[in-house]
């Protein structure tokens, strides 16, 4: 009997994983089942794609969990893999009054069938030397982040001298933002490290779901949509993603 107060952990990040060789599908299934024996947070279900064949839709606790599982599948089981762009789960409010949760862009109903899409938001904490505050703020703002607070973790000098100014620039500062989870899935961490010369660290926690102006972006190859390349994105970013 389970102890009271505990609940299974819910996956927050989802991606499709397909073998590069179609005949490796059974081996991929067996490998995922073996990993799941020691990793109850890993969830997966069969998925088929017209472009990529048979694979699995996998759910992870976060980005590190996703990267670790993919790396183990390749290293420990010798599998060649194709992974689709990571996504989050969205809450879709239907015109019937019901709501559904989707973790695959291909499952989003037609525009006329729903009133609203809600996406998960996280509270993100970034710790960095103070000299990189400007670069961090610019990055988070470009990702639809909402500023919450900033706090110096070390006392700063108040007298005006070259030595003390340098010390102030190296003092650690903590910045706190609310930001959509989808905005930190792909390149956020790399850009954060690049903009701070590797000095910044980050942590985040889920806070709630919020309504957003989201649309489904289909990618066409030879004038035909490729389901594996579809994504849900903010309307204002759809054009730039489509051209990328």
Summary of predicted features, one role per range:
Residues 1-244:
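Structural and coupling elements of P-loop NTPases
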């Amino acid at each position: 009997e389970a102890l009271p107060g505990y609940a299974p952990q819910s996956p927050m990040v989802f991606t499709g994983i397909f073998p590069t060789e179609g005949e490796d599908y059974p081996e991929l299934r067996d490998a995922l089942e073996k990993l799941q024996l020691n990793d109850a947070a890993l969830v997966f279900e069969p998925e088929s794609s017209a472009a990529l064949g048979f694979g699995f839709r996998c759910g992870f606790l976060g980005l590190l969990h996703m990267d670790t599982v993919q790396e183990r599948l390749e290293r420990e089981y010798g599998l060649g893999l194709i992974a689709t762009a990571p996504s989050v789960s969205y809450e879709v409010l239907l015109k019937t009054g019901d709501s559904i949760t989707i973790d695959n862009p291909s499952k989003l109903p037609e525009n006329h069938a729903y009133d609203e899409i809600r996406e998960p938001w996280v509270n993100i904490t970034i710790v960095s030397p103070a000299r990189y505050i400007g670069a961090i703020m610019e990055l988070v703002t470009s990702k639809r982040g909402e500023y919450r607070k900033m706090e110096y973790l070390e006392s700063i000098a108040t007298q005006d001298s070259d030595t003390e100014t340098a010390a102030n620039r190296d003092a650690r500062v903590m910045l706190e933002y609310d930001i959509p989870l989808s905005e930190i899935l792909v390149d956020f961490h790399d850009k954060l490290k690049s903009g701070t010369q590797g000095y910044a660290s980050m942590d985040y926690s889920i806070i709630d779901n919020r309504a957003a102006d989201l649309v489904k972006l289909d990618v066409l190859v030879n004038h035909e949509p490729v389901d594996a390349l579809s994504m849900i994105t903010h309307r204002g970013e759809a054009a730039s993603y489509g051209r990328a």
